[in-house]
Amino acid sequence: MDIDASCSLVLYGKSSVETDTATRLKNNNVLKLPDNSKVSIFLQSEIKNLVRDDDSSFNLSLFMNSISTHRFGRFLIWSPYLSSTHDVVSHNFSEIPVGSVCVSDIQLKGRGRTKNVWESPKGCLMYSFTLEMEDGRVVPLIQYVVSLAVTEAVKDVCDKKGLSYNDVKIKWPNDLYLNGLKIGGILCTSTYRSRKFLVSVGVGLNVDNEQPTTCLNAVLKDVCPPSNLLKREEILGAFFKKFENFFDLFMEQGFKSLEELYYRTWLHSGQRVIAEEKNEDQVVQNVVTIQGLTSSGYLLAIGDDNVMYELHPDGNSFDFFKGLVRRKL
């Protein structure tokens, strides 16, 4: 069996329920890629003896043994090489269980906002998973829940290993930074079907690849032995544990239940930014101070005139903080 082919997918379930689902998907051959290229489906039991102990590939068993969730991450799709994990879960949303995750060792066309495309090498944790929501008003906020779960997962794994915490920060709306350099990002897309929003969440996190910026282990390698460095599988398992807890709080109590922790983790409290406001035919620039988030997920800021404003990106800049447009509340 050639599991190194670019269109090979390996299915692995946490329990007999997910294992039966994997077998059914393989037998029915229903998983497809957006370009309709041929897909080879394998079960984890078929390939486990072909993976070497020193293999740098994602360790499926290590991840699955770390999972203690009830819904998320219990059904795994893994591939050594994919164009996009996000495309796999979004294109097959109706075929796979809600909460399924797709992981790839190498990703050539990872999806970013405004159709940006990212190439991700080995050592980067690249995954996409699915969830369902009914209230469209809070769907835009799910990216903040995901961002927070990633930072808290890294913190938990560091604590368990006795390591000093890598201080990963959130740059609004969906980037992750370490020591001033971008090490990750989140993308959420959704479609509406049968009165539900079908949300596909994509995450990329530099764990063990120092290019193109830096990574989590680059900060740790000088202070701990290689055997104690962070592993992608451990971080992903910790992420789903955190996310499931945060998601339940979010759905029951709203984002207010997570705001305090989120604001301790993001980079922007008290940040002064330039916002633009159209005044008849002129564009006026004003300096405002970021206070937090509005109920719709945009930036809440206060002007020097003590008036509260909601800040929106203009959509024309790669940096969200260039070209902010303000709207009086």
Swiss-Prot record:
Superkingdom in the source lineage: Eukaryota
Keyword annotations of the record: Cytoplasm, Ligase
Record's protein name: Biotin--protein ligase 2
Species, as recorded: Arabidopsis thaliana (Mouse-ear cress)
UniProt keyword annotation of Ligase present: yes
EC class: ligase
Phenotype of null mutants: No visible phenotype under normal growth conditions.
Location in or out of the cell: Cytoplasm
Keyword Ligase attached: yes
Entries under CDD domains matching the protein: BPL
Residue positions binding biotin: 84-85, 107, 111-113, 182
